[in-house]
């Protein structure tokens, strides 16, 4: 590729944008929600380091790639049909906008409309007049933070529902030990294996991941 085919400054900005891919992988996919739910589940069980953080993030990444595979495939097809044009900034912006359209559609579908409207109202108050006048609900500057907030909210909702049966087990074990006069026995000593047994009997991890998969569709 000769230097006549692209603008050096545009190419440099494009390379710089590639360094943001790990961050975008977190905030623009279902990775955030899946990792949150897995960490909350581990805390609800009561084991702080099993599985370790690295393993949980690996599971979350694998699950994210599984869920996002159709979206990434559509993006790959978009870029194959219309490769990034780095001749100038406007052409590059148009190419990227067209390429990330499937990802934007995914984020919009999984975004709470109320949160998106709230951020749009905030943009009118906080952004300069010319900029706020041109903003729409399809603007990535609104869609991305609205999607992140929606994923956080959904993750905590799922985590709360997961916590309930484990809290019930803790309360039952504590009351039984108190009734038997075994105050010296730590409730966690008995509740932990019961929680693990519950997960095994109901095939908990598979059901949890299935639920997360379908919640991201």
Swiss-Prot record:
Keyword Phosphoprotein in the entry? The reply is no
Q: Domain of life of the organism in this record?
A: Bacteria
Gene Ontology CC terms: plasma membrane
Keyword Transmembrane helix set for record: yes
* Location of the protein in the cell: Cell membrane
InterPro entries hit by this protein: T3SS_IM_P, T3SS_YscR-like
Transmembrane domains' residue ranges: 11-31, 52-72, 158-178, 185-205
Tell me a GO biological process for this protein. Answer: protein secretion
**Per UniProt, which keywords does this protein have?**
Cell membrane, Hypersensitive response elicitation, Membrane, Transmembrane, Transmembrane helix
Q: How does it sit in the membrane?
A: Multi-pass membrane protein
Give the protein family: Belongs to the FliP/MopC/SpaP family.
Q: Which PANTHER family match?
A: FLAGELLAR BIOSYNTHETIC PROTEIN FLIP (PTHR30587), SURFACE PRESENTATION OF ANTIGENS PROTEIN SPAP (PTHR30587:SF2)
Q: What does this protein do?
A: Required for the secretion of harpin.
What's the protein name? Answer: Harpin secretion protein HrcR
Please state the gene responsible for encoding this protein. Answer: hrcR
